[in-house]
């Protein structure tokens, strides 16, 4: 078992991550330098398994996504670019900040085999 960062995200944060990664993928594809790992990470984030709650009153849907260091950097950079874009157009950024904070504070855990 490898040690990877566990990004435990809500459904909204998962959607933000997928949108941010797909935006980065489209930008790189438009430049003529597609980077397939970004697309694969977006698909993995979309298909992330639900977190198993230990207590019955935990109602918030959480999803577990294990990230190696390169994937963690891609997720961090993509969410930061989305946050910067939202600042530039004057939209609220509270949700993007929460998603970025959760990615930055992801701890190393024993990841299951892929």
Model-inferred region functions:
Residues 1-114:
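Positively charged, low-complexity terminal tracts
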């Amino acid at each position: 078992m490898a040690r990877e960062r566990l990004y435990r995200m809500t459904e909204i944060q998962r959607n933000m991550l997928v949108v941010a990664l797909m935006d980065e993928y489209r930008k790189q594809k438009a430049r003529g330098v597609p980077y397939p790992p970004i697309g694969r990470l977006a698909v993995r984030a979309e298909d992330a398994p639900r977190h198993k709650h230990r207590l019955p009153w935990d109602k918030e849907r959480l999803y577990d996504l294990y990230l190696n260091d390169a994937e963690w950097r891609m997720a961090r950079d993509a969410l930061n670019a989305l946050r910067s874009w939202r600042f530039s157009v004057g939209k609220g950024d509270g949700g993007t900040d929460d998603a970025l904070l959760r990615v930055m504070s992801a701890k190393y855990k024993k990841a299951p085999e892929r």
